[in-house]
Swiss-Prot record:
Binding site for ADP-alpha-D-glucose: K15
Gene name for this UniProt entry: glgA
Keyword Cell membrane: no
Biological process annotations from GO: glycogen biosynthetic process
Native organism: Thermosipho africanus (strain TCF52B)
Pathway listed: Glycan biosynthesis; glycogen biosynthesis
Tagged with keyword Cytoplasm: no
Record keywords, A-Z: Glycogen biosynthesis, Glycosyltransferase, Transferase
PANTHER family from the UniProt entry: ALPHA AMYLASE DOMAIN-CONTAINING PROTEIN, GRANULE-BOUND STARCH SYNTHASE 1, CHLOROPLASTIC/AMYLOPLASTIC
Protein name: Glycogen synthase
Pfam families reported for this sequence: Glyco_transf_5, Glycos_transf_1
Disulfide-bonded cysteines: none
Function: Synthesizes alpha-1,4-glucan chains using ADP-glucose.
């Protein structure tokens, strides 16, 4: 089975968020399931800048390719590289007009850019002679790929057996643009209606992806259910309910080589479950680095996040002072809304021995927080998958979360009698329940040492591997292929 993963960002070539990590890692693990993966992405400016940093080279292999149907004469070249350490080819679509911005999601016209890329994918595959069984597209930027496949390319013999899987990483971003882009796209006018890509007088690229893909998944089973409700559906819940029988939830994995407490060079001291006392050496060194009193008797609560409402900052702001009045230390890393940046800085001044507010993004400090904290806080309003809780589990740091999306699928409430579970949480999006969950975790840390040790063991034994995820993806590739047979 040949699968082309199509994405705007892929680690290490261009990364803005978690999407890049997913598309950079998944192909490596698909190979273990008799899948032949290739990757297609735009050649953003940042891709060339990252080449030296991540030791990969770019080679131009095709040039001056036209994109029929579109109202443009812009041609594209194709560059090739490989996912580092593998022979998995990455094909980059290069065009100086559309992909000349410094960053991934920038450019003179984001709608035209996404339309151009989506249509160029088909011409690139033909020129390369890459007959793929599955086009695995990601988020709204690639949402028109299945629309082109089922309309303008439906009689093209080259794609007669090709199916599409759409992965929705965050339903909050949909690619909604003025209806005038229909003309540029070359897509048939009949698509501009409520059963097509029309959306409240505009066009919606993600809606096109949902309606025209053979199968759809999102990045956790719980989020797949949530987005079919009015509360989480972002006005697409009706469309998603329509496709309910083709909608799946697959948790992302994490890269076990990259996130490994036994070998991670970014943390102070390496450790394993067998040498868990070395985790506490990390804790003391983090306390020292951040000017907090060095003690193991007080739990360190870590939080690495964008400082926005979605991440639960509104309810946390109501109870943070109550939390700091417990015998705890709180370490924050992140940037975002100015009001929250200032709030954390103000609270740090009030509680200098208990609070360390690091208003920045620092990948090394992030790893140190995952490894050195006792607890990791994620009170999100919604969380499609969430990676923070996975990293913290891997490092034996106990998550305290709101049970939503991927958080509900990865964190299991600790059961004292059965000694099962790997964390603590709350369901109701309310600051009182958040406070209660933190208090419960602090109580276990201070007064139930045997249970705390068991929690760490359960956390570090949780299966968060890409192997598991890749196996699930192969199952739905096959479901899509069976639909077309």
């Amino acid at each position: 089975m040949k699968v082309a993963l199509v994405s705007y960002e892929v680690y290490p070539f261009a990364k803005v968020g978690g999407l890049a990590d997913v598309v950079g890692a998944l192909p490596k693990y698909l190979k273990n399931f008799s899948v032949e993966p290739i990757v297609i992405m735009p050649k953003h400016k940042i891709v060339e800048k990252n080449a030296e940093k991540f030791s990969y080279s770019l080679r131009k292999i095709k040039e001056s390719i036209s994109v029929p149907y579109l109202k443009t004469d812009e041609k594209f070249d194709i560059y090739q590289t490989f996912i580092p350490g593998t022979q998995i080819p990455v094909y980059l679509i290069a065009n100086d007009y559309y992909f000349s911005a410094e960053q991934v999601y920038e450019g003179p016209d984001l709608a035209e850019q996404a339309i151009y890329f989506s249509a160029a994918v088909f011409e690139a595959l033909k020129v390369l002679g890459e007959k793929v069984d599955v086009l695995h597209i990601n988020d709204w930027q690639t949402g028109l790929v299945p629309v082109y496949l089922k309309t303008l390319y439906k009689d093209d013999e080259f794609f007669s057996k090709t199916v599409v899987l759409l992965t929705i990483h965050n339903l909050g971003y949909q690619g909604i643009f003025d209806s005038s882009y229909m003309n540029f796209s070359g897509l048939p006018d009949y698509l501009y209606n409520i059963d097509g890509i029309e959306f409240y007088g505009k066009i919606n690229f993600l809606k096109g992806g949902i309606l025209f893909s053979d199968v759809i998944n999102t990045v956790s089973p719980t989020y797949a259910q949530e987005i079919q409700t009015k509360e989480y559906g972002e006005k697409l819940d009706g469309v998603l309910r329509l496709r309910s029988s083709d909608l799946y939830g697959i948790l992302n994995g994490i890269d076990y080589d990259e996130y490994n407490p036994e070998t991670d060079k970014r943390i102070y001291v390496n450790y394993s479950l067998q040498e868990i006392e070395k985790k506490y050496e990390n804790k003391k060194m983090l306390q020292k680095e951040l000017n907090l009193p060095q003690t193991n008797d007080v739990p360190v609560i870590g939080m690495i996040t964008r400082l926005v409402d979605q991440k639960g900052l509104d309810i946390l702001s109501e109870v943070l002072r109550y939390i700091l009045n417990m015998d705890v230390q709180f370490v924050l890393l992140g940037t975002g809304d100015k009001k929250y940046e200032e709030m954390f800085k103000d609270i740090e001044k009030e509680f200098p021995d208990k609070m360390s507010a690091n208003i920045t993004f620092d990948i090394v400090l992030a790893q140190k927080i995952y490894a050195s904290s006792d607890m990791f806080l994620m009170p999100s309003r919604y969380e499609p998958c969430g990676l923070g809780q996975m990293y913290s589990l891997r490092y034996g740091t106990i998550p305290v979360v709101r049970y939503t999306g991927g958080l509900a699928d990865t964190v299991m409430e600790y059961d004292e009698e059965a000694m099962k579970g790997n964390g603590f949480g709350f369901k109701e999006y309310d600051s009182a329940y958040l406070l209660k969950a933190v208090a419960r975790a602090v109580d276990f840390f201070k007064n139930k040492k045997g249970h705390w040790k068991k929690l760490i063991e359960n956390a570090m034994k949780t299966d968060l591997s890409w192997e598991r995820s890749a196996n699930e993806y192969v199952k739905i590739y096959n479901k899509a292929l069976n639909k077309r047979r």
